[in-house]
Design a protein with these regions (language model features):
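Structural detector for short beta-strands of small beta-barrel domains
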Residues: 6-35
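Short, charged beta-turn/beta-strand-edge "cap" motif at the junction between a beta-strand
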Residues: 79-85
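C-terminal partner/receptor-binding element of secreted or periplasmic proteins
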Residues: 91-106
Length: 106
């Protein structure tokens, strides 16, 4: 099993833990092989004082499936090459500082 996995093609299981307005989405990943420097180990939502663990802000807001509801889980890959050029409103909702661009898999 000496195959080196390309990290970019790894599939991860995410959970949409906060579906904020204007695509301010917070995603939780509890997989140890997910790049740990891309997530915040602990993050407290100052609007609700709720603490989350292992979360990031959704950067790739343009093609995130609308069908995914808060607390739904989904499979995804990290995709840092995509451009996120779409209109989105700018209302402030607290989100983690770290953001990741992803592609959701069906």
């Amino acid at each position: 099993s000496g195959l080196i996995k390309e990290p970019i093609s790894n599939t991860f299981l995410g959970k949409l833990v906060k579906k904020g307005i204007c695509m301010n989405y917070v995603i939780e990943v509890n997989e140890s092989d997910f790049p740990q420097d891309m997530i915040e180990k602990k993050w407290t939502d100052e609007s609700s004082n709720k603490e989350y663990k292992n979360v990031f802000r959704l950067e790739s807001i343009c093609d995130f499936p609308e069908s995914i509801k808060e607390n739904d889980s989904f499979n995804f890959v990290i995709d840092n090459d995509k451009e996120n050029l779409c209109a989105v409103c700018y209302a402030y909702t607290p989100t983690p500082d770290k953001s990741v661009s992803i592609t959701v898999l069906d």
